[in-house]
Amino acid sequence: MRMYLWLLAALCLGFLWSAAAPQQVAPQYLSPRWSRQLPGGRIEDSSPTLYDLDGDGKLEIIIGTTKNGASPVLAVLEDDGTIKWSVTLPDPVNSSPAVADISYPPDGIPEIIVSTGGDVTQQRGSVIAFNRNGVQLWRYDTTDAQGTGTPSGNWSSPTVGDLDGNGDMEIVFGSWDRNIYMLNHLGQYQWHYHVADTVWSTAALADLDRDGDLEIIIGTDIAGGGVLPDGYRPTDGGFVLILDKNGQKLARRQMNEVIYSSPAVGDVDGDGRLEIFVGTGMYWYLQGRYTQPYVYGFRVNTSGSEWVLEDLPGWPQPVAYPGMSSPALADLDSDGDLEIIIGTGYAGSSEPNQCPPHCYGALYAWHHNGSPVSGFPMWPKDYMGKNAFIRSSPTVADVDGDGQLEILFSMNWDVLVVGPNGQQEDILHTTYSLFASPAIGDLDNDGKTDVVIGGSNYYDSSRGYVYAFTFGANSYNPALQPWPMFHRDPRHTGYYPQPPRLNVSPSSLYLLHQYGSGSAETAYLRLRNTGDGSFHWAVSSIPSGVTVVPSSGTAFYISTALLTVTVSTTGYETGTYSLGNAIITGASGGSPVQGSPASIPVTLYVGQVHRSYLPIILRSAR
């Protein structure tokens, strides 16, 4: 697409503001515990990934740099900021490295996968895998869609997952060469899906129909005037796409604006179905088509041959500004369902007396039904009291140990911390413009929350710098880290896992017994885990004369256990008998799972049982 000029403009605005040293004002702020210069260029849109690469119980920081000022590098830092290793790359990184064990069979040792070329003027695109010691394992180059003589660049971060459930990890990414790709664990091409325009969005992976295979959910650009390979005639805007494991289109929703945002997927309302959330971008907005920007919430209708992305009740929600931010999902108010959080804005900054109403960036949070969370939207202010655009995607965790979640994002030179009520809390101050998402964790396993972000330094702006901030003693709460890094996890799945959920069907049993014909009747129950993970289940109580086999077991994701229920009919005269309830419980980690206990009423009818047989006619196809 004619897609790069707006990015140049936005970057120039951001760095022009950075050209003057900040004048300190009065707000409370947190200084870095350490900062580290990297041997590569500035860090712009590469969000750090945290992972224990070497198994020492401490987290390493994995991040990439641009080519602005120095050669680009992929760097791994220890918890104290020591550079563990760095490798020089031929092309810049504006994506977030993914970390996963992609070996087949799995060996428990993680690898690092990074996409390159996401730069307006230096867009030689590749996806490269390294082992945990920085040795290159493979490299895959995209195609030259723009005719520059080099592969088109990749802004999209790689997403890693086992799409077909066979134990072999796949890598999915979008490219500026107008394709969505899937590679196998060896970096070998598996398929591509042509979208006829650039892809900036990072793919989410989720099993939308609970069949054991992962679907790919991703946003794209589109320019109208042509015909897609399947005959569809698009208009100017973008798409939200769902692809299956083989690269076949399951659903496509035409949008009136490009989609730079990376989708977030989760069961936000607790109904057992997954929802999809994504924001609209600003390419066409900057061309003078000032259509209303939105954040969308979708439910997937899988009943037809082609799935349909349907608007959720209360969605889409209008926002003041378009942008590049991707939504995060978290239970901000501890009510058991998930809220949707996103930043907005694309360029500029303003003084306090101009904002509101003349702001450039806002942070939004909604309940699952589209109603705003109390205190949102809010217009954050940085260290200098300025409001600015928010290109960063929010991350969410309890960073101060108070039992409540905070929202973190970068704006101007700072990482800002906002409470669940929309009140701005801490300001984590650096010395240069920040665009990426902060990562949250306990780097050195000392019980304190660490926040990591990449950027540069006003006095050394040709180099990349990594900053780490540390909160107080006992501030790290591992149970309250719902969205701690870009696209939630080191694989960048963008998926909020569902808790294990006990499901037993049918919900009641009605057994028919022909009087005088035997001593027992049999029926069946199907027990499933309709959530993620696993749980132990057991038949805790049954009526007299009733047996259930098996009586206990472990329910894994999408597994089904067939339970045989046998009712003794000895001693019953004709009539209908309510025998009582079979009680089945499920527990994980010592706590009941959702749907537990399941109570199944058992009813026995004894008398004359009549059977009717219906004819069926079969005709073979010729």
Predicted segment positions?
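Short acidic/proline- and small/hydrophobic-mixed sequence motifs that coincide with surface turns
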Residues: V373, A520-E521, D532-W537, Y577
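C-terminal edge beta-strand
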Residues: V593-G607
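Beta-sheet-dominated interaction scaffolds and their linkers
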Residues: P499-T530, T569, L604-G607, P615
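Extracellular/luminal low-complexity segments enriched in Ser/Thr/Pro
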Residues: L562-S578
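Sec-dependent, cleavable N-terminal signal peptides
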Residues: M1-Q24
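Surface-exposed binding patches on compact interaction domains or structured appendages
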Residues: P500-Y510, R528-T566
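A short beta-strand micro-motif common to beta-rich folds, especially ectodomain repeats
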Residues: L525, E573-S591
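Extracytoplasmic/lumenal domain signature
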Residues: P22-P500
